[in-house]
């Protein structure tokens, strides 16, 4: 056989196998199996003659048949995106977490655009800015799971506290806390008491009354009155 000007030798096909069953007659129970066809790669190199072309066309025909038998997708690309968004909203509902505004906003816009009353009839979300969009929450596959991680692969498996991003164990972590318990210090404000004469001063003046006549006081009561007046003046 010639292929592209060169003679290529193909080995002859193997002989047919004749398995025999045990019996008296050697011709009884002879089963003749068809010899296998020679190997055809179908690489388009000219080996195998027209067989390669026919095998290639058969493969293309079978692939076309598979494509025709496969049912077309029932959803478009936009419909699949909307379905994924609704599934994500349902996960937030199931976890008891608040749904981010940017997930609800496209639904609100589609309803407002399809309504005959116009967007003015739905003022609840009118005027929302970009601050209401939480893009990190939109990429969260498990919104009800605690977000505490070690920065690598580990992540806490507990459920979040409603209204927070972390579980009960990690919700207060990271806040500035004192290691020592705070004790209430009872600060006593300084009080100013009026100056009063001591009792021993009165007793001393009373016992020394006879010897005070040379100082110009006629009695001990006058001396006590003068001492009290002087102490009050100093206090003021």
Curated annotation (Swiss-Prot):
GO biological process terms held by the UniProt record: developmental process; DNA-templated transcription; regulation of DNA-templated transcription
Residue stretches making up the WRC domain: 140-184
Primary localisation category: nucleus
Single GO MF descriptor: ATP binding
Record remark on domains: The QLQ domain and WRC domain may be involved in protein-protein interaction and DNA-binding, respectively.
Subcellular location: Nucleus
Biological classification of the source: Eukaryota, Viridiplantae, Streptophyta, Embryophyta, Tracheophyta
Protein name: Growth-regulating factor 12
Motif (Bipartite nuclear localization signal): 145-155, 173-180
GO CC annotation terms, alphabetical: nucleus
Family under the similarity heading: Belongs to the GRF family.
Domain QLQ: 74-109
PROSITE patterns (UniProt xref): QLQ (PS51666), WRC (PS51667)
Organism domain of life: Eukaryota
Keywords assigned: Activator, Nucleus, Transcription, Transcription regulation
InterPro entries, per the entry: Gln-Leu-Gln_QLQ (IPR014978), GRF (IPR031137), WRC_dom (IPR014977)
Signal sequence residues: none
Function in brief: Transcription activator that plays a regulatory role in gibberellin-induced stem elongation.
SMART domains in the cross-refs: QLQ
Pfam families named in the record: QLQ, WRC
